[in-house]
Every structure is written in C-alpha cells, then in structure tokens.
C-alpha cells in the first residue's frame, strides 16, 4: 500500500511540475517549444546516428545497427519516447527504461556519453539553451533507471 501511495504522489508531482512549467512558458509544452514532431524526429534521428558512430557506446546498439530497417525502427521508437517525454501527443509502446536496460550492463560512463551525444545533437539543431537544459534534465532523471549496478542488474 505504501508503494502505491508513493507512486501516486510521484505521478501527481510530475504532472503538477509539468503543468507549472507550461504555465510559466505561456501554456506551451516543451514539445511545442522544441518545434513539434519535425524537431523531435530530427533529434531522434541525429542522436541515433551519433550513437551508432560513437565507439564509446555503439556496442550497446548492435541490433539497431544491424540493418537499415532496424536503424529506422529504433529511430522511430526513440522519437516516440522523446515525444511522449516532452509532452507531445505521441504514443510510446516500448518498454519502460528499467525493463529496456535490465541486464545490459549500461555503465555511468556510457550513459554520460549518450547524454553528450544528445547535447551535441541539440546544439547542431540550434535548440535554445532553456529548452536544451530541460531536455537534459529529463534525460538525467532517467539515469537511475538505465545505469546498471550490481544491485539492479540481477
């Protein structure tokens, strides 16, 4: 019961924070401020291209790199995840971050390298600093769900 209450409080807090952020930004979601779906697709596509070329992390993405079809599918899934995460209308049907990364041995260094790739992609697309910071904070909040420690990899 306690876990349920904590979960409800966390969900309510995130929704309240999201609504507060929209009010502060003239009612526009981060999705809208980033430029909508075309911008989200550009972020996802560019990020996947960067990840697949990044020798620090590409070993975790061999399936995505195994064929053009798999690369495109991964880009589409990532775009849906980003879209949903920044308040867009997309439906994300993929796994949650814990399930998607369980047993993969993702290190803090690998997470940071992907975050660096994302930051460079946002810079290339000339995303304003405020929105870039919000995206990077969202990504940072995912780190505990993605990075594997001895306790989480079991």
Specify the residue positions occupied by each region the protein language model found.
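Core of compact, soluble alpha-helical bundle domains
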Residues: 20-154
